[in-house]
């Protein structure tokens, strides 16, 4: 659950965000095995990160039952974590972000939300600056490392970021040139027959999504050693056990998907799911 936000917070040491996840995870684990009438009420500090940022947007306490408000908080936490600006944030909401409802906020409110996010998540914002430096290092052939990743280049504009599983993200033919339409310089790299732009927030997104995928893929391999995995979608894994082993399979999958990998031992991971005789959400 919420794996990209968790990886982004972990990669840049946004410790308050990680602690918020730990508290909400602990509450969920505590009450999950209890009948609904025996569950204690959730405290404000046990709400998830989406609800918490919803407070900022709406100026009141947001709970999971506030579906629209929490959804907007989710869009903020996921989208703004990769350097999305106010104008794009406004357009994203108006189009129906993440398949959700269309929401129209004035630009001034979007600017306030973006500023507030960056101030509250200042270590993530600093991570974008680190990523900008990584781009420049790759272009110049300068090597470096941060936590579980390392990077370098051949000195001729071809750069790469090495991931903890041995795979790499490649950025060939990096160039910095002025974008006359936008009025500022930007980095681009060759992708097939096209040139694609790359900047701090976008490289951050690439790294976070790659690391999140590695986590889920390794979890899937652990599960597949005991129960046959039949499909995966984003951060979802589906296995096909015998009916009599369904509950055991679910418990095993839950254990696998909440266990960090060796290169990120302190990241808080969470999962939710269930079993049925047919595939459903």
Language-model segment annotations:
Residues 1-281:
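Conserved catalytic core of nucleotide polymerization and phosphodiester-bond processing enzymes
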């Amino acid at each position: 659950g919420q794996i990209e936000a968790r990886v982004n917070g972990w990669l840049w040491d946004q410790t308050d965000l990680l602690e918020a996840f730990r508290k909400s995870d602990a509450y969920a684990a505590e009450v999950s095995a209890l009948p609904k009438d025996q569950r204690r009420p959730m405290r404000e500090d046990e709400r998830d990160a989406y609800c918490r940022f919803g407070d900022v947007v709406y100026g009141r306490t947001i709970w999971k039952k506030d579906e629209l408000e929490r959804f907007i908080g989710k869009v903020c936490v996921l989208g703004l974590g990769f350097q999305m600006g106010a104008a794009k944030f406004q357009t994203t909401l108006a189009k129906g972000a993440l398949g959700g409802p269309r929401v129209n906020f004035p630009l001034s409110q979007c600017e306030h939300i973006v500023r507030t996010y960056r101030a509250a998540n200042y270590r993530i914002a600093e991570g974008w600056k680190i990523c900008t430096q990584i781009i420049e290092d790759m272009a110049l052939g300068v090597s470096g490392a941060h936590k579980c990743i390392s990077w370098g280049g051949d000195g001729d504009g071809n750069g790469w970021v090495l991931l903890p599983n041995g795979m790499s993200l490649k950025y060939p033919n990096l160039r910095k040139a002025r974008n006359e339409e936008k009025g500022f310089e930007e980095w681009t790299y060759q992708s097939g027959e096209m040139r694609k732009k790359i900047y701090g927030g976008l490289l951050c997104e690439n790294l976070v999504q790659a690391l999140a995928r590695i986590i889920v893929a390794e979890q899937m391999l652990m599960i597949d050693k005991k129960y046959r995995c039949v499909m995966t979608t984003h951060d979802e894994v589906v296995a096909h056990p015998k009916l009599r082993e369904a509950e055991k399979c679910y418990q095993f999958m839950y254990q696998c998907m909440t266990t960090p990998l060796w290169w990120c031992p302190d990241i808080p991971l969470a999962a939710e799911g269930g079993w049925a005789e047919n595939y459903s959400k």
